[in-house]
């Protein structure tokens, strides 16, 4: 899979852009704060309809403009797909091959993209919300049902939390309605949790192999999904998970009413990374964090390929300078001939380009792009 051409209008600091891309390696070079990361963000947004940097789509629209537009043609092994997005202050619309999509879940997955940035170090040391967002973004683009259930979960969770707050301040007393919301939320939660268990198991297998190779077989990486409902185990099916979530709601009801919020479910779950049986959150050095993050990204590539039969587009935002020569070589060797790759950097020096053959280089300056001569 590769992005053959790309257009944008009024996105971040870009007024207008139209360009073709190389199917293999594309390098965006230029000083900081010129738009390199914004361009990668735009490509990522075209794929997932979400930014990795903000939850507010309004921030993506260029100051003084009423909307932003993105468009691109994606080549897959069997077909070509035209993608288009339009963002306004009121929301976004999506088109596939000029047909407007009624739901974004029908759009996401047409183009798969994996992003690796310095902020990914937070995957290990950051808050649980960082790891939950990671799961939702990555699993949502490979499974439209996961994306659908995640959207439904947020809506019903908000309803249930609002009603719990009403109960907490004595403005409501209908426990039967709370039962209805609990049953609905538990059913959706079970669908999400069962998929997370499945995908984390696969991701763990790929990441373990990648990490072993990068570390020279010196370290063993393990990734575990940690549901907030402690009774849930990996062998549970959807129905069993549902029953355990419902039981958790009933057990926690007095506390939930007192606090006015739902205390368990996918929105409270977490991931745990172990290095040689030790919790990486507490013990991993910065170098080990980088190796874990890199291993997870390489595992994502394999997971997407397994489930879609296509290699995703890889976006590397200012990470080459963060990796030593060995990790750079491992990364470039791993992706060579597999993925279309976009790399941002301020300087071509000090990077292991020996594996990359004739990359296409673009200069980014003040929201403009120009291809550099070979």
Swiss-Prot record:
CDD domains: ABC_RecF. One of its GO terms (molecular function) is single-stranded DNA binding. GO terms for cellular component: cytoplasm. ATP binds at residues 30-37. It is found in: Cytoplasm. It holds the Pfam family SMC_N. Keywords: ATP-binding, Cytoplasm, DNA damage, DNA repair, DNA replication, DNA-binding, Nucleotide-binding, SOS response. The keyword Hydrolase does not apply. GO terms for biological process: DNA replication; DNA synthesis involved in DNA repair; double-strand break repair; SOS response. It comes from the Bacteria. InterPro entries: DNA-binding_RecF, DNA-binding_RecF_CS, P-loop_NTPase, RecF/RecN/SMC_N, RecF_2. Belongs to the RecF family. PANTHER family: DNA REPLICATION AND REPAIR PROTEIN RECF (PTHR32182:SF0). HAMAP family: RecF (MF_00365). The RecF protein is involved in DNA metabolism; it is required for DNA replication and normal SOS inducibility. RecF binds preferentially to single-stranded, linear DNA. It also seems to bind ATP. This is DNA replication and repair protein RecF. The lineage of its organism: Bacteria, Bacillati, Bacillota, Bacilli, Lactobacillales.
């Amino acid at each position: 899979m590769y992005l053959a051409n790309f257009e944008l209008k009024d996105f971040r600091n870009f007024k207008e852009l139209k360009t073709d891309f190389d199917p293999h390696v594309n390098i965006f070079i230029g000083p900081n704060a010129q738009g390199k990361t914004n361009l990668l963000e735009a490509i990522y947004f075209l794929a997932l309809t979400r930014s990795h940097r903000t939850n507010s789509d309004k921030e993506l629209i260029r100051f003084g403009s009423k909307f932003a537009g993105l468009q691109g043609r994606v080549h897959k092994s069997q077909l070509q797909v035209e993608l288009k997005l339009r963002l306004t202050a009121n929301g976004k619309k999506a088109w596939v091959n000029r047909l407007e999509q009624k739901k974004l879940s029908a759009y996401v997955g047409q183009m798969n993209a994996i992003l690796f940035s310095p902020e990914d170090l937070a995957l290990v040391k950051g808050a649980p919300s960082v790891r939950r967002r990671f799961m939702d973004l990555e699993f949502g683009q490979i499974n439209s049902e996961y994306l659908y259930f995640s959207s439904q979960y947020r809506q019903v969770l908000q309803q249930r939390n609002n009603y719990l707050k009403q109960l907490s301040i004595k403005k409501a007393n209908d426990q039967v309605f709370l039962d209805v919301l609990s049953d609905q939320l538990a059913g959706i939660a079970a669908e999400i949790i069962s998929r997370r268990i499945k995908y984390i198991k696969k991701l763990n297998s790929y990441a373990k192999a990648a990490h072993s190779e990068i570390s020279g077989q010196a370290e063993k990486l393990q990734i575990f999904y940690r549901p907030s409902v402690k009774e849930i185990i990996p062998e549970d099916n959807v129905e069993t998970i549902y029953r355990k979530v419902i039981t958790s709601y009933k057990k926690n009801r007095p506390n939930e009413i007192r606090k006015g919020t739902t205390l368990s479910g996918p929105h409270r779950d977490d991931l745990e990374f172990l290095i040689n049986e030790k919790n990486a959150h507490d013990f991993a050095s910065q170098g080990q964090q980088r190796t874990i993050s890199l291993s997870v990204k390489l595992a994502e590539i394999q997971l997407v390929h397994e489930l879609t039969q296509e290699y995703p587009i890889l976006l590397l935002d200012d990470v080459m300078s963060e990796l030593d020569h060995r990790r750079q070589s491992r990364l470039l060797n791993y992706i060579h001939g597999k993925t279309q790759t976009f790399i941002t950097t301020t300087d071509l020096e000090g990077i292991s380009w020996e594996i990359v053959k004739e990359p296409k280089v673009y200069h980014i300056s003040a929201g403009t792009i120009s291809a550099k001569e070979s």
